[in-house]
């Protein structure tokens, strides 16, 4: 049981049939951080009534709805004096995301976004190894996020609601794959390397029958410091499940992290043996206090997605409680990802030209 005062929260969306709603609830319960005291789980319910009746009675609101309502719900909650953790993307447009960032700052509210992979212990180790110069100067990054989820759908039948809204521009916005999972990869690149993506050249495609939005993207990136990146993201990668694979190449060493084997991190050197770091091994604390702090169970017992999600919530709830900065993705990261989404869309529309992020 968490000895700190338990928080109270409400949730919009994430009801029956939702994938992400139960993930939020399980993640919060993992550390006994907060109690769910109210909710609005169906489109037939009015989230405005929820915000009105919860004003001054909850510590934060979790927004787990489709993309189209992220902005208006988050804005209303911030204006009502609530802290908010909103599902990605933060909004449907860069202008909306920027407005929410400014509103949160003006209202002195905590605004978080669950870019889950930054909550994984070995991602923190990767970030800290880069920070301490283990890889040297970063020259190249390769990020792959491959899912085959759209290959499992029978498009001759009505789509289930979990997939249907992601292909509907009115609910998903102008992008499917880049805004849905591409933002995770973008955030992972910037989080681990400490570099900013400055430009993008994007080639977006729609292969799934009837999909009006992108379900596959091949992109080149230019990063601060002169580094370059290759970034591919897909929902039509046949046979793949959730293949997030990150490679970072420096002039001294390189690293490799695979989400499907996320308890390990590989570092390679030109004139020395490869090192395989294991999550929560005895030496980890000396290399990365953050990685050690995020590990929950002994090495050899695998942790994964829900634990990573719970780590985001643990940091977010700490910020809600003590009103100090903590290590979780916030409004700034939400704005950065929307800058990237819009730049990728412009590049694709303008003949695959380089666009500023």
Where do the PLM segments sit?
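Rossmann-fold dehydrogenase core element
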Residues: 99-117, 137-140
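Predominantly a Rossmann-like dinucleotide-binding segment in NAD(P)-dependent oxidoreductases
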Residues: 5, 16, 118-211, 265, ...
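C-terminal helix-rich "cap/oligomerization" subdomain common to oxidoreductases
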Residues: 1-6, 49, 60-62, 272, ...
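Beta-loop-alpha module in the N-terminal Rossmann-like domain of NAD(P)-dependent dehydrogenases
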Residues: 43-103, 310
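Hydrophobic residues in well-ordered beta-strands that form the structural core
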Residues: 86, 92, 111-113, 257
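Glycine-rich, aromatic-lined ligand/substrate-binding cores of catalytic
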Residues: 184-188, 192-254, 259-263
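N-terminal Rossmann-like dinucleotide-binding module
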Residues: 1-42
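C-terminal glycine/acidic-rich active-site capping loop/insertion
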Residues: 6, 218, 223, 252-328
């Amino acid at each position: 049981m968490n000895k700190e005062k338990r928080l109270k929260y409400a949730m919009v969306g994430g009801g029956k049939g939702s994938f992400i709603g139960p993930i939020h609830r399980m993640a919060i319960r993992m550390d006994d951080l907060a109690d769910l005291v109210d909710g609005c789980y169906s489109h037939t319910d009015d989230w405005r009534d929820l915000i009105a009746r919860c004003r001054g009675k909850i510590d934060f609101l979790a927004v787990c709805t489709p993309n189209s309502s992220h902005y208006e719900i988050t804005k209303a909650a911030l204006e009502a004096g609530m802290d908010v953790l909103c599902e990605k993307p933060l909004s449907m447009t860069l202008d909306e995301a920027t407005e929410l960032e400014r509103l949160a700052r003006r209202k002195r509210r905590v605004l978080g976004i669950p870019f889950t992979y930054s909550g994984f212990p070995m991602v923190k180790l990767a970030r800290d190894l880069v920070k301490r110069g283990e890889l040297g100067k970063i020259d190249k990054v390769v990020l792959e996020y491959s899912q085959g989820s759209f290959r499992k759908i029978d498009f001759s039948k009505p789509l289930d609601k979990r997939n249907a809204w992601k292909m509907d521009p009115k609910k998903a916005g102008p992008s499917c794959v880049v805004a849905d999972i591409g933002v995770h990869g973008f955030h992972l690149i910037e989080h681990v390397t400490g570099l900013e993506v400055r430009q993008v050249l994007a080639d977006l495609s729609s292969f799934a029958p009837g999909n009006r939005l992108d379900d596959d993207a091949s992109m080149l990136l230019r990063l601060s410091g002169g580094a370059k990146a290759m970034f591919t993201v897909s929902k039509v990668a046949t046979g793949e499940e959730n293949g997030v694979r990150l490679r970072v190449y420096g002039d001294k060493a390189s690293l490799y992290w695979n989400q499907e084997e996320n308890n390990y991190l590989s570092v390679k050197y030109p004139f020395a043996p490869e090192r395989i770091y294991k999550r929560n091994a005895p030496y980890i604390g000396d290399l990365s206090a953050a990685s050690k702090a995020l590990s929950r169970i002994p090495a050899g017992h695998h942790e994964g997605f829900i634990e990573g999600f719970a780590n985001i919530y643990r940091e977010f709830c700490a910020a809600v409680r003590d009103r100090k900065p903590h290590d979780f993705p916030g409004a700034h990261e939400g704005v950065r990802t929307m800058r990237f989404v819009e730049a990728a869309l412009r590049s694709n529309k303008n003949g695959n030209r380089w666009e500023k992020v």
